[in-house]
Amino acid sequence: MLRTMMKSKIHRATVTHADLHYVGSVTVDQDLLDAADLLEGEQVCIVDIDNGARLETYVIAGERGSGVIGINGAAAHLVHPGDLVILIAYGMMNEQEIAEYDPKVVFVDERNRPVELGSDPAHAPEGSGLTSPRSLTFA
């Protein structure tokens, strides 16, 4: 059996521009693509932290070191410059692949530069103001 697992995540990136009159996709700085193990043309889910919008599209490689996170085409109606987003890619894996695979989790700063790389999808970096779901307790 194959399971759909998170393989890559770029967490809390800032949208740098949105262009309604483009053929579609999301443009992402090549440095971020490398860090997250994402390829041009790969399907991603975009989650807008500011307004809750979720959409699927594909990745276009942007200029290395530019910090670009560009929302292109119809998605520009849902996601706007300045919004914080999470980009997530999933992969189909068998049980052996799941046991051996470490997802790529990339945290970025306000200029979309990688500041922390990891593999725990629930990790909240120290000083980020985020809470890991692993730290929640229930009475």
From Swiss-Prot:
* The record's free-text note on cofactor binding: Binds 1 pyruvoyl group covalently per subunit.
Q: Organism, per UniProt?
A: Nocardia farcinica (strain IFM 10152)
Q: What GO CC terms are in its UniProt record?
A: cytosol
Metabolic or biological pathway, per its Swiss-Prot or TrEMBL entry: Cofactor biosynthesis; (R)-pantothenate biosynthesis; beta-alanine from L-aspartate: step 1/1
Q: Name one GO biological process term.
A: alanine biosynthetic process
InterPro entries the UniProt entry points to? Asp_de-COase-like_dom_sf, Asp_decarbox
CDD domains for the chain: Asp_decarbox
Q: What is its EC number?
A: 4.1.1.11
Under which name does UniProt file this protein? Aspartate 1-decarboxylase
Name the predominant localization. Answer: cytoplasm
Q: Which Gene3D superfamilies match?
A: 2.40.40.20
What post-translational changes are documented for it? Is synthesized initially as an inactive proenzyme, which is activated by self-cleavage at a specific serine bond to produce a beta-subunit with a hydroxyl group at its C-terminus and an alpha-subunit with a pyruvoyl group at its N-terminus.
Query: What does the record give as cofactor?
Result: pyruvate
**Pyruvic acid (Ser) modification sites?**
S25
Q: What does this gene product do?
A: Catalyzes the pyruvoyl-dependent decarboxylation of aspartate to produce beta-alanine.
What GO MF terms are annotated? aspartate 1-decarboxylase activity
Major enzyme class: lyase
Region Disordered, annotated ranges: 116-139
Keyword terms of this UniProt record: Autocatalytic cleavage, Cytoplasm, Decarboxylase, Lyase, Pantothenate biosynthesis, Pyruvate, Schiff base, Zymogen
| Lyase is among the record's keywords | yes
